[in-house]
Amino acid sequence: LGSRAVNRINNVRTMRGLQFAEDASPMAHPIRPDMVIEMNNFYTLTVYEKGAEVIRMIHTLLGEENFQKGMQLYFERHDGSAATCDDFVQAMEDASNVDLSHFRRWYSQSGTPIVTVKDDYNPETEQYTLTISQRTPATPDQAEKQPLHIPFAIELYDNEGKVIPLQKGGHPVNSVLNVTQA
């Protein structure tokens, strides 16, 4: 019952049941609010639960090795001192040489994106097409929303359970798709 997978499922249930509701309410706010009226209002599901999910997405985007390099650099720079979300993302960028400027929107934009996934398989051409789109509904604090950077991990299997290598235009591609447009 205490397995990693079961814990992950429980965390996702908390996110969907509580944090998504907070993100859709008049209390919606970004992970990194511009201002805090009352310090107790800062400790919310958005700051902690959604913030943790954003860090998991950075891990998915960068991969284990680059994420660990980023963590090491972050601790070297900020151990024992106050640090910000921007400090964390900067360490990840510097360690991996990956531009995360688009990804930073997760910290400044409130709301939960609605992700739509459509798939189609053509048996004649043996081609599988995946179409992913996103939109984030307006929130009281932000009427206009920008598309977020969503790393989308995917793996396909054949009838025998073997991994099918992903290709785009006949060339191998990474199993993490980067959704950056609406």
Model-based region annotation:
Residues D99-H102, S110-A182:
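Beta-strand-rich binding/interaction modules
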Residues L1-D119, E124, L130:
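Hydrophobic alpha-helical and helix-loop surface patches within well-folded domains
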